[in-house]
């Protein structure tokens, strides 16, 4: 089974955009938090990240909670920012998208392990 995946895109030398996809069958078991925390820790400790951010659709409650559990702050929400799906008539369905972010110094404060 594939539980999910986490990924990071390097925006510049010290800034990364992160994201994840997880199989709904494994929700609520802590896998997403463990995997995402591992990714953030790697980026801050090994890859030289200073800032990490991610985009989350406003109605994706689980991903928003995950960002908050990771210590990321909500920095804003873009109205009708992006679309990944279509409406029933085939037209693009634009979704409100929030930005969550965390700095290395914040991560070091909350992740003392």
Predicted segment positions?
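Acyl-donor (CoA/ACP) binding surface of acyl/acetyltransferases
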Residues: 1-113
């Amino acid at each position: 089974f594939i539980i999910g995946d986490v990924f990071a895109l390097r925006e510049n030398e010290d800034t990364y955009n992160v994201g994840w996809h997880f199989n709904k069958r494994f929700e609520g078991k802590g896998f997403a938090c463990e995997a995402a925390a591992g990714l953030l820790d790697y980026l801050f400790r090994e890859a030289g990240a200073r800032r990490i951010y991610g985009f989350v659709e406003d109605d994706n409650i689980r991903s928003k909670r995950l960002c908050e559990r990771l210590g990321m702050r909500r920095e804003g929400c873009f109205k009708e920012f992006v679309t990944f799906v279509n409406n029933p008539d085939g037209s693009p369905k634009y979704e409100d998208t929030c930005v969550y972010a965390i700095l290395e110094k914040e991560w070091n404060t909350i992740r003392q392990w």
